[in-house]
């Protein structure tokens, strides 16, 4: 879905009539947005309006909704905003989920968005609609920090850019080889896509004595295995890798 640039005021006003809102979503290419996401965005708007009743601040404009990155890996971004010096990403959750799940998503988003430009600071947030708790991702400590909407509002630049910079990453590969790029692997300059995360989860949670991992060439099998090994090693487990090679005589 390629969203148009959304102004939160017009987004709210268009909801007064079902037909108008249906047309608004169509012309802005946000037909896939669901009711829980709409509710969360409405709450964010109301919080911003409390801080700026005139709604004239630039923080009300410049949003891309439901943007999908479909390069080598696949990710979806609920709210994105680009300005000359900053990228804002706000993820929307209807109910509270584990902090670990939130962190995994924001780490992936941080890596992708940080690849756009070294001149643009990246700020990542998650808003839980049910509890109205807002978290900011601390990239230094890789932790979630509960913050106020005033802090978020102040973090958003007045200016914005009407271009989705994710489109510039289409031909960029974010799957690395732990064999040939060990420095990137050990400095965590990679992430697993959704399918790889699911495969990793099955491996870690399996109660079987032997588990096999199958996949076509280039799907990241080695990366998954090395990632599992690194995680287990960091938790105090001892890991042994045995590499089987076929010798021709």
Q: What does each model-identified segment do?
A:
Residues 90:
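Conserved beta3 VAIK motif of the Hanks protein kinase fold
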Residues 93:
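Structured beta-strand/turn binding interfaces of compact recognition modules in eukaryotic regulators
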């Amino acid at each position: 879905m390629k969203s148009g640039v959304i102004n939160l005021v017009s987004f709210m006003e268009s909801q007064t009539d079902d037909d108008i809102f249906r047309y608004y979503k169509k012309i802005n290419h946000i037909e896939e947005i669901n009711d829980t996401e709409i509710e969360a965005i409405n709450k964010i708007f109301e919080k911003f309006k409390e801080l700026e009743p005139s709604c004239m601040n630039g923080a009300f404009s410049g949003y891309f909704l439901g943007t999908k990155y479909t390069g080598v890996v696949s990710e979806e971004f609920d709210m994105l905003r680009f300005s000359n010096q900053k990228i804002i990403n706000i993820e929307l959750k209807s109910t509270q989920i584990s902090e670990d799940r939130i962190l995994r998503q924001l780490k992936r988003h941080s890596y992708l968005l940080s690849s756009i430009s070294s001149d643009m600071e990246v700020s990542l947030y998650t808003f839980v609609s049910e509890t109205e708790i807002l978290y900011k991702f601390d990239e230094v400590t890789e932790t979630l920090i509960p913050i106020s909407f005033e802090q978020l509002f102040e973090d958003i630049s007045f200016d914005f850019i009407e271009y989705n910079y994710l489109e510039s990453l289409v031909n960029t590969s974010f799957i690395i080889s732990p064999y040939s790029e060990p420095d990137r692997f050990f400095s965590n300059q990679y992430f697993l896509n959704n399918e790889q995360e699911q495969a990793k989860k099955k491996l870690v949670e399996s109660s079987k004595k032997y588990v096999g991992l199958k996949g076509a060439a280039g799907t990241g099998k080695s990366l998954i295995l090395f990632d599992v090994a690194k995680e287990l090693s960091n938790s105090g487990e001892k890991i042994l890798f045995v590499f089987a090679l076929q010798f021709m005589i």
